[in-house]
Regions:
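Bacterial N-terminal signal peptides
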Residues: 9-20
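Histidine-rich, glycine-flanked metal-binding segment
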Residues: 26-29, 36-80, 96
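Histidine/acidic residue-rich metal-binding segments in metalloenzymes
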Residues: 164-341
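Alpha-helix-loop-beta-strand connector modules within alpha/beta enzyme cores
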Residues: 78, 133-149, 153, 199-213
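Metal-associated gating/positioning segment near the N- to mid-region
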Residues: 72-145
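C-terminal cap of metal-dependent C-N hydrolases
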Residues: 34, 355-359, 415-480
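His/Asp/Glu-enriched, well-ordered alpha-helical/loop segment
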Residues: 233-263, 312-314, 334-335, 339-341, ...
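Divalent metal-coordination and catalytic microenvironments
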Residues: 34, 47, 52, 74, ...
Length: 496
């Protein structure tokens, strides 16, 4: 269509005026006098949020007309957390199932936001749907009831055939899905179709998809459990003997070999032992695309808790290990070889976790800790000088955002990023109590622990959703967050 220069300028001018008007109408939030901390460093500055994004960072910013001002003097201003490993139910069944996961997007969000986590993940099976229908279903469920933002890992299941098909993989990436998991080497079905899974990981890597691996050798564990039960040693108190460290080590070695042979990126879920971490570190030193997650419980608890009467509360897989393993994981965070902390939140009820009929061969694995994992890491890590606050931000926000293709929209505080911000009180003290938990499970893995440092205010995309102990965000305001196709990230505090 032909158009005069004057007409074109008039339209451009009209667009500029409209954009200016829209910007002027956006709500403004000005956070003053805080210490802004990112993975790269810290600065005393003001932070302007306009609409859903960070608009300006600098000293002595002037408030716009109608701006809400928050005085963050004495506070840390950190990015909202990104939990790369969360298990939520899109919709709870009616009637409820007492022995199943009790948290949906709404209840899981409440705990997350209270703990300073603004973006969670979930694992959803592809089933027989095309990528477009899958994406619509996933986004619809999230945006119907979530308060936190959510990204999704595609679950492969026992049949990897579809994940060897380039068209399926390209369609998934195009719709914002660039990670698969949880791929269970711990299941005997993996070994029965090892070639199929190998081809799926190879094809996924070529398509820009990261494979997330649960690393335990199924045969070692199955034989161990069978032997213990047959010998009358099946009590849950003996569970620490049922899945030895070598089962994790062998599986990590296997996953590293897959990464080396195919070039595909791999993400090792909930690494629990020093020996498994050392295998991954050796792979990183050779430049392989290997990423390590650990789970909060491995940093705070050891296998000694299996002697407690309430042993069921502390059972998950891989199992808890020894003090030397705990120390190695803390060291890995400090030197950058443990890249992320994933809560692996699975909210069984306390009654289900304490079911006395459980044995080493039949138990409910999972921890209710989405609300507490970030405060626990700050209290036990930063407040006790094990790690810096920058490293805290790295493993709980920046690194997961980078690894899973959400950065720089998520995981940082910079102009143009989503305004996911937590005002963190570094000195406030609190005792964790079951009655304060916002999860439907209504208990905490860390009940009775003393915390130093807590979120005071949580802001998700420019909206205050948690403040002074109360969640005020509404279900249905969370968004599905599409991932970018996997590209090798540059991570702070690490050479990978």
């Amino acid at each position: 269509m032909n158009m005069s220069i004057g007409r074109m300028l008039a339209l451009v001018g009209g667009v500029a005026v409209a954009m200016a008007t829209t910007a002027a109408q956006q709500s403004e939030l000005l956070i003053r006098n805080g210490l802004i901390v990112t993975a790269e460093g810290r600065v005393e500055a003001d932070l302007r949020i306009r609409g859903e994004q960070v608009a300006e960072i600098g000293p002595n910013l002037q408030a716009g007309a109608g701006a809400r001002i928050i005085d963050a003097r004495g506070m840390l201003v950190v990015p909202g957390g990104v939990d790369p490993h969360t298990h939520l139910v899109p919709e709870l069944p009616n009637p409820p199932r007492p022995n199943a996961n009790q948290d949906d997007y709404a209840s899981g969000s409440r705990g997350a936001l209270a703990g300073g986590v603004t973006t969670v993940s979930n694992f959803i099976p592809l089933q027989d749907q095309p990528a477009s229908a899958y994406a619509d279903r996933v986004a619809g469920d999230i945006e119907k009831s979530s308060i936190a933002d959510v990204f999704v890992h595609v679950t492969i299941g026992n049949d990897p055939t579809r994940f060897t098909q380039p068209t399926t993989l390209r369609d998934l990436v195009a719709r914002g899905f660039s990670s698969t998991g949880e791929d269970f080497l711990a299941n005997l079905s993996f070994d029965r179709n090892a070639l199929g899974f190998y081809k799926a990981f190879k094809a996924s890597g070529a398509a820009g998809i990261l494979s997330m691996m649960h690393c335990e050798d199924a045969s070692i564990i199955a034989d161990s459990k069978e032997t213990m039960v047959a010998e009358g040693r099946g009590s849950l108190h003996n569970i620490g003997l049922s899945a030895p460290t070598v089962a994790e080590v062998v599986a990590v070695q296997r996953v590293v070999a897959i990464a080396e042979a195919t070039g595909a990126p791999v993400y090792i879920l909930h690494t629990s032992s020093a020996r498994a971490l050392h295998v991954a570190e050796e792979a990183m030193s050779r430049g392989l695309p290997v990423y390590v997650e650990t789970r909060p419980v491995y940093l705070h608890l050891t296998e000694d808790v299996y002697l407690r009467p309430d042993v069921g509360l502390y059972v998950g897989t891989p199992l808890l290990r020894q003090k030397r393993d705990q120390d190695a994981l803390w060291e890995g965070i400090a030197k950058g070889t443990v890249h992320t902390i994933g809560s692996d939140h699975t909210a069984f009820s306390k009654e289900a976790k304490l079911d006395p009929t459980q044995t080493v061969a039949n138990f409910r694995a999972g921890f209710n800790n989405l609300q507490d994992y970030r405060p626990m890491l700050y209290s036990e890590g930063v407040a006790k000088a094990r790690i810096t606050v920058e490293q805290f931000v790295s493993v709980t926000a920046t690194n997961p955002a980078k690894i899973f293709g959400l950065y720089p929209r998520k995981g940082t505080i910079q102009v143009g990023s989503d305004a996911d911000v937590v005002i963190w009180d570094p000195t406030v003290k609190k005792t964790i109590r079951d009655q304060d938990e916002l999860s439907n499970a209504r208990y905490s893995t860390y009940s009775g622990w003393e915390l130093t440092g807590l979120p005071r205010t949580t802001i998700r995309r420019g909206e205050i959703v948690f403040d002074s102990g109360k969640v005020i965000g509404k279900p249905g305001t969370g968004k599905f967050i599409p991932q970018q196709g996997w590209q090798r990230p540059r991570l702070p505090h690490t050479s990978s």
